[in-house]
Amino acid sequence: MNPIAVTLLTGFLGAGKTTLLRHILNEQHGYKIAVIENEFGEVSVDDQLIGDRATQIKTLTNGCICCSRSNELEDALLDLLDNLDKGNIQFDRLVIECTGMADPGPIIQTFFSHEILCQRYLLDGVIALVDAVHADEQMNQFTIAQSQVGYADRILLTKTDVAGEAEKLRERLARINARAPVYTVTHGDIDLGLLFNTNGFMLEENVVSTKPRFHFIADKQNDISSIVVELDYPVDISEVSRVMENLLLESADKLLRYKGMLWIDGEPNRLLFQGVQRLYSADWDRPWGDETPHSTMVFIGIQLPKDEIRSAFAGLKK
């Protein structure tokens, strides 16, 4: 039985998540999609906006599914599986829409820490929507708005028809998250091929989306930022493990996501790793072949000790 692919929609209040969700549900993509959404307050509004195109909508109220009501999220996920197994509903993809003030971190961890959920669901990717009109002000005022960008596998820039292309904002987003490509979306209309099957939580060699350019952005502007570490020499596997363990011991609470491709001394294959906060995995990938071996790592987090991290990896050079 193949696991059910899960897409998480995040983004600050008014960024356009429900508009995008409505577009997803009305597209002729051939998927049977279940939806979990959550709202502040007693009554859901978005389920009235979405319509009845989803197989089943679970509306979670009275708190964020991503933080204070994580048990309720687990119950909703298990309830969907129970109804699926009983034949009451059919779906082959799940979309979770987080409320605008929610931290995606705990919901991501749910899919790795719950025995049944990690077997039956596969977290495919995190899609962050960013309002081009208000994003700078929101990110200046609310660290959570930066955090949502930091967790993303894809960043969708909305309202550029009003704000323009917002090149400085793109630079800022790249500084926060060096591994997520940025796409423009107007009124939720976007090729779903860019949103589905992103393999955001699979071990892969594409660690950094592009070489970010940061000359527009001052360090003090973002609480959350990316650190890209590149090494042109092999590293000992036990030594790099020690560095990673120390990093997690000292900064796990500050780390959002991290990925890497490592050149391990004496090994013909590249080693890939990826993690979310304290949870991470690693595995051997294909041989280097004719490619020049190298290591590339990206760490995304809150006020990370950049100099210490770079120094720790630089110390691995023999």
Predicted regions and their residues:
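Nucleotide-state-sensitive switch-loop elements of NTP-binding domains
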Residues: 2-138
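Amphipathic coiled-coil/heptad-repeat helices and related helical stalk/stem segments
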Residues: 73, 141, 166-169
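Structural motif
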Residues: 86, 118, 144-147, 219
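Short amphipathic alpha-helical segments
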Residues: 92, 223-227, 295-297
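C-terminal accessory "lid"/substrate-recognition subdomains
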Residues: 147-289, 302-318
